[in-house]
Structure formats: structure tokens, C-alpha cells
Amino acid sequence: MSGSSSVAAMKKVVQQLRLEAGLNRVKVSQAAADLKQFCLQNAQHDPLLTGVSSSTNPFRPQKVCSFL
């Protein structure tokens, strides 16, 4: 039983390796440059960099309403 399961496992490994061999690869330097350019282009829309206005912040402390 272990022989047939070993063959099946190896077939899965070969299939995965064939899939990975067919992928297009990008150099790390090119990927880093693209990521940096994307970050710089979209920095004005990033709430972690620009902050969130208090009127649109759903996590702001709620105001207490009290009736006299």
C-alpha cells in the first residue's frame, strides 16, 4: 500500500513542479521597483499615510447623548 501511495505522492510533486516551471518569473529588482512606483502613485489614497477624517472614521469614540 505504501508503494502506490508513494507513487501517487511523487506524481503530485511532479505535477506541481511542472506547473511552477511554466510560471513567468520577474527579477527581484524589477519587482521592487514596480512595488515602489505603485506605492508612490497611490500614497495619497492610503489612510495609514494620510489619516482618516474624524467625520468618516467608523471607529471614533461615540458621543454620549443625555437628556435632562
UniProtKB/Swiss-Prot annotation:
GO terms for cellular component: extracellular exosome; heterotrimeric G-protein complex; membrane; plasma membrane. The modification Phosphoserine is found at S2. GO terms for molecular function: G-protein beta-subunit binding; GTPase activity; PDZ domain binding. CDD domains: GGL. The modification N-acetylserine is found at S2. Pfam families: G-gamma. InterPro entries: G-protein_gamma-like_dom, GGL_sf, Gprotein-gamma. It is found in: Cell membrane. Coiled coil: none annotated. It comes from the Eukaryota. Its main location: membrane. The modification Cysteine methyl ester is found at C65. It is a lipid-anchor. One of its GO terms (biological process) is signal transduction. A lipid is attached at C65 (S-geranylgeranyl cysteine). G proteins are composed of 3 units, alpha, beta and gamma. Belongs to the G protein gamma family. Guanine nucleotide-binding proteins (G proteins) are involved as a modulator or transducer in various transmembrane signaling systems. The beta and gamma chains are required for the GTPase activity, for replacement of GDP by GTP, and for G protein-effector interaction. This is Guanine nucleotide-binding protein G(I)/G(S)/G(O) subunit gamma-5. The lineage of its organism: Eukaryota, Metazoa, Chordata, Craniata, Vertebrata.
